Amino acid sequence: INEYSASNCDNDGSDCGDYEDWIELFNNSQEPVDLQGYFLSDKIDNLLKWQFPNSLILQPQDHVIIYASGLNPDLEISSNETSFKLSQTKNNEYIILVSPDFTTIDYVQLSRHKLNHSIGRTFDGASDWSVFSESSPEGSNTGSSISYKATPYFNYDAGFYENSIELNINCDDVNVDIYYTLDGSIPNTGSNFYGTIDQNGNIQLSEPGLVLDNTVVVRAIAISQDNEYLNSFVETNTYFLNQEHTLPVISLAGSQVDNLLYGNQIRPI
């Protein structure tokens, strides 16, 4: 197992015509390998979940992409379409490669990654894993990053508050700049600057705290100062100030929410 993506909205090479999750296998030996009879699974308690039905020769130092499309196994059998999908929202999600004699060849637990990013070995066949902001399905792994910076967090949970609150943003990481927005947009270096955390973990604030008087969506990101790391995931909280309600409330924040509301597409926001 050399690389995978469970957030693919860019590479469409599957038979079902959708942007499917994908798994890249790499033959690090000097001999060709026929994958017929091998198994792939996403669950450690069901190692034989999907089996390669046909002959598929993987040449030495070559790659092959398997799409985790979740196709109904009763439909036409495909050599590169598994019966399961990958999910970043489950804690027990793996990719497991098993030989025809039921020996586990390789496995990796899924790590969370951003849209169109991938997780892969730092270079083809390496023992360590990295993040790739530019995935390379069926290509050599290059341009890796160690990981994402830690996601910022707030001192108040999202929810309803009767009075104004003073919001603080922190991050359990070093060498990051924290930016935030109050309009629901994804923060970047052009957004509101909150502060810097230096290499010793000391935070230098541009302002003492955010005083929230009205209902607002706050989103924050940690921008990496290190080339070896990628920017963090975005943390989003909605604060309802002095708002009465009698029904359950759901708050959505994203730049493509309209597409979801009107059924144009299924896509991360």
Give the residues covered by each predicted segment.
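Activation on beta-sandwich/Ig-like modules and their edge loops
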Residues: 1-129
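Short, compositionally stereotyped local motifs that mark structural "simplifiers"
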Residues: 4, 57-60, 66, 113-269
